[in-house]
């Protein structure tokens, strides 16, 4: 999220203005929180359960659709937020969520002192899976991720949006056991922005002296330099994330400074001073070719997504890999908000091209049966929701995942 609060007023004001442009809520009936039984509800049928994530603008709760018995994710934002953005994010999801790889959005409406957005519940994030795999992915896994995410980002861009929040925490696999459990999904459009003006239908103008928006570890060099972001910056940030997965860390992690501003300056300086050849040393040349291409793009230029995809699909085929969705975490127990799941390795994997088609997202399998005492949304669901204290983010990432991460004392994360 926008971590430079002292210098990020422009972005926050922009978010306020944009959020006011869309006032239509979901067609579902609106229902305030609380019922005669004291259970916290969103709309007519979504029961609010335990907290499973948090962010700078609110928190994430596990929920349940009482009509279908399906679990959902419920994102909450205080109505009196100084920089409301949830309705804007809801609008972006409505623009996007008719394709594979974007979670379905089910509802937007009030929940007591909060606005609530109800989303499809997904599985672990790539960061969680990275931990599960001892913080290194094989080339095969990175290429399967990269091929899908280039397609995801291309789709976002075709909807006149730039994403501006690339990081492993924002890319999730489907919920284990669902039809899309092996697809990589993109979530959290709180920092997304329209790069095509809806009035003029023209590309936004090039600007400088912009506040930093995104995650410092992965953001593009031009973002560090205060330049307005465009399509090229999303793709460069993806390239940095791909190298993070292959290397296990990036050269600009772990830098120390007296202030956050100085730290982000050091990250940007180190990023610029690290030659692409050094960053990608000992890895296939295609990784360096990708980064060279996206860094040379003009601000207004439309990237050649097919070229970038072909770079990786050709490398994938030459390496003798099969696109069988057997990632490095295949067969490992996956933690979810409703318990650990032991996924099955796909016996009849879909063809690679299916991950790139913009087909309608399928609903998750319902959790059949009556509600019981083991239901994570049943207990303490009438507990008050405490808005997280507004604190300055002290590192490049924030907590924003679909389940709580286990703390590891032996490892310093997000340096």
Swiss-Prot record:
<dbReference type="GO" id="GO:0005886">
    <property type="term" value="C:plasma membrane"/>
</dbReference>
<keyword id="KW-0547">Nucleotide-binding</keyword>
<comment type="function">
    <text>Serine/threonine-protein kinase. Casein kinases are operationally defined by their preferential utilization of acidic proteins such as caseins as substrates. It can phosphorylate a large number of proteins. Participates in Wnt signaling. Phosphorylates COL4A3BP/CERT, MTA1 and SMAD3. SMAD3 phosphorylation promotes its ligand-dependent ubiquitination and subsequent proteasome degradation, thus inhibiting SMAD3-mediated TGF-beta responses.</text>
</comment>
<keyword id="KW-0723">Serine/threonine-protein kinase</keyword>
<feature type="active site" description="Proton acceptor">
    <location>
        <position position="165"/>
    </location>
</feature>
<dbReference type="GO" id="GO:0106310">
    <property type="term" value="F:protein serine kinase activity"/>
</dbReference>
<keyword id="KW-0597">Phosphoprotein</keyword>
<comment type="similarity">
    <text>Belongs to the protein kinase superfamily. CK1 Ser/Thr protein kinase family. Casein kinase I subfamily.</text>
</comment>
<dbReference type="Pfam" id="PF00069">
    <property type="entry name" value="Pkinase"/>
</dbReference>
<dbReference type="GO" id="GO:0005938">
    <property type="term" value="C:cell cortex"/>
</dbReference>
<dbReference type="GO" id="GO:0016055">
    <property type="term" value="P:Wnt signaling pathway"/>
</dbReference>
<dbReference type="InterPro" id="IPR000719">
    <property type="entry name" value="Prot_kinase_dom"/>
</dbReference>
<feature type="domain" description="Protein kinase">
    <location>
        <begin position="46"/>
        <end position="316"/>
    </location>
</feature>
<feature type="binding site">
    <location>
        <begin position="52"/>
        <end position="60"/>
    </location>
    <ligand>
        <name>ATP</name>
    </ligand>
</feature>
<comment type="subunit">
    <text>Monomer. Interacts with MTA1 (short isoform) in the cytoplasm. Interacts with SMAD3. Interacts with DUOXA2.</text>
</comment>
<keyword id="KW-0067">ATP-binding</keyword>
<keyword id="KW-0808">Transferase</keyword>
<dbReference type="GO" id="GO:0005634">
    <property type="term" value="C:nucleus"/>
</dbReference>
<dbReference type="GO" id="GO:0006897">
    <property type="term" value="P:endocytosis"/>
</dbReference>
<dbReference type="GO" id="GO:0005524">
    <property type="term" value="F:ATP binding"/>
</dbReference>
<feature type="compositionally biased region" description="Basic and acidic residues">
    <location>
        <begin position="1"/>
        <end position="17"/>
    </location>
</feature>
<keyword id="KW-0418">Kinase</keyword>
<keyword id="KW-0963">Cytoplasm</keyword>
<feature type="binding site">
    <location>
        <position position="75"/>
    </location>
    <ligand>
        <name>ATP</name>
    </ligand>
</feature>
<dbReference type="InterPro" id="IPR022247">
    <property type="entry name" value="Casein_kinase-1_gamma_C"/>
</dbReference>
<dbReference type="InterPro" id="IPR008271">
    <property type="entry name" value="Ser/Thr_kinase_AS"/>
</dbReference>
<feature type="region of interest" description="Phospho-regulated basic and hydrophobic (PRBH) motif">
    <location>
        <begin position="369"/>
        <end position="415"/>
    </location>
</feature>
<dbReference type="GO" id="GO:0090263">
    <property type="term" value="P:positive regulation of canonical Wnt signaling pathway"/>
</dbReference>
<dbReference type="InterPro" id="IPR017441">
    <property type="entry name" value="Protein_kinase_ATP_BS"/>
</dbReference>
<dbReference type="InterPro" id="IPR011009">
    <property type="entry name" value="Kinase-like_dom_sf"/>
</dbReference>
<keyword id="KW-0879">Wnt signaling pathway</keyword>
<feature type="compositionally biased region" description="Polar residues">
    <location>
        <begin position="20"/>
        <end position="37"/>
    </location>
</feature>
<dbReference type="GO" id="GO:0005737">
    <property type="term" value="C:cytoplasm"/>
</dbReference>
<dbReference type="GO" id="GO:0007165">
    <property type="term" value="P:signal transduction"/>
</dbReference>
<dbReference type="InterPro" id="IPR050235">
    <property type="entry name" value="CK1_Ser-Thr_kinase"/>
</dbReference>
<dbReference type="GO" id="GO:0004674">
    <property type="term" value="F:protein serine/threonine kinase activity"/>
</dbReference>
<feature type="region of interest" description="Disordered">
    <location>
        <begin position="1"/>
        <end position="37"/>
    </location>
</feature>
<dbReference type="Pfam" id="PF12605">
    <property type="entry name" value="CK1gamma_C"/>
</dbReference>
<protein>
    <recommendedName>
        <fullName>Casein kinase I isoform gamma-2</fullName>
        <ecNumber>2.7.11.1</ecNumber>
    </recommendedName>
</protein>
């Amino acid at each position: 999220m926008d971590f430079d609060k002292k210098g990020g007023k422009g972005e926050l004001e922009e978010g306020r203005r944009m959020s006011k442009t869309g006032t239509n809520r979901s067609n579902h009936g609106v229902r305030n929180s609380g019922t005669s039984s004291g259970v916290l509800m969103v709309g007519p049928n979504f029961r609010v359960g335990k907290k499973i994530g948090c962010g700078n603008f609110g928190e994430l709760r596990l929920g349940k659709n009482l009509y279908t018995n399906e679990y959902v994710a419920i994102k909450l934002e205080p109505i009196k937020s100084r920089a409301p953005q949830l309705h804007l994010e809801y609008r972006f999801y409505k623009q996007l969520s008719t394709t594979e790889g974007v979670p379905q959005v089910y509802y937007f409406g009030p929940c007591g002192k909060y606005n609530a957005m109800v989303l499809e519940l997904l599985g672990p994030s790539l960061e969680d899976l990275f931990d599960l795999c001892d913080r290194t992915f094989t080339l095969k896994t990175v290429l399967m991720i990269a091929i899908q995410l280039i397609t995801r980002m291309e789709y976002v861009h075709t909807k006149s949006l730039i994403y501006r929040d690339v990081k492993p925490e924002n890319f999730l696999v489907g919920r284990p056991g669902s039809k899309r459990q092996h697809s990589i999904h993109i979530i959290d459009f709180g920092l997304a922005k329209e790069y095509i003006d809806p009035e003029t239908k023209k590309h936004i103008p090039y600007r400088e002296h912009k506040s930093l928006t995104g995650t410092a570890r992965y953001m593009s060099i031009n973002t560090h330099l205060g330049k307005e972001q465009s399509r090229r910056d999303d793709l460069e940030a993806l390239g940095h994330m791909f190298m993070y997965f292959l290397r296990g860390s990036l050269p600009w992690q772990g830098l120390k400074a007296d202030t956050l501003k100085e730290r982000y300056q050091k990250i940007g300086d180190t990023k610029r001073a690290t030659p692409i050849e050094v960053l990608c040393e000992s890895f296939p040349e295609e990784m360096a070719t990708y980064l060279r291409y996206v860094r040379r793009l003009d601000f207004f230029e439309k990237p050649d997504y097919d070229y970038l995809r072909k770079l990786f699909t050709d490398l994938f085929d030459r390496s003798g890999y099969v696109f069988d969705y057997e990632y490095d975490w295949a067969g490992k127990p996956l933690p979810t908000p409703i318990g650990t799941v032991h996924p099955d390795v796909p016996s009849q994997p879909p063809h690679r091209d299916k991950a790139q088609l913009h087909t309608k997202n399928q609903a998750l399998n319902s959790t059949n049966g009556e509600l019981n005492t083991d239901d994570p949304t049943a207990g303490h669901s009438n507990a008050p929701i405490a808005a997280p204290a507004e604190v300055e983010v002290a590192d490049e990432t924030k907590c924003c995942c679909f389940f709580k991460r286990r703390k590891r004392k032996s490892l310093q994360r997000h340096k």
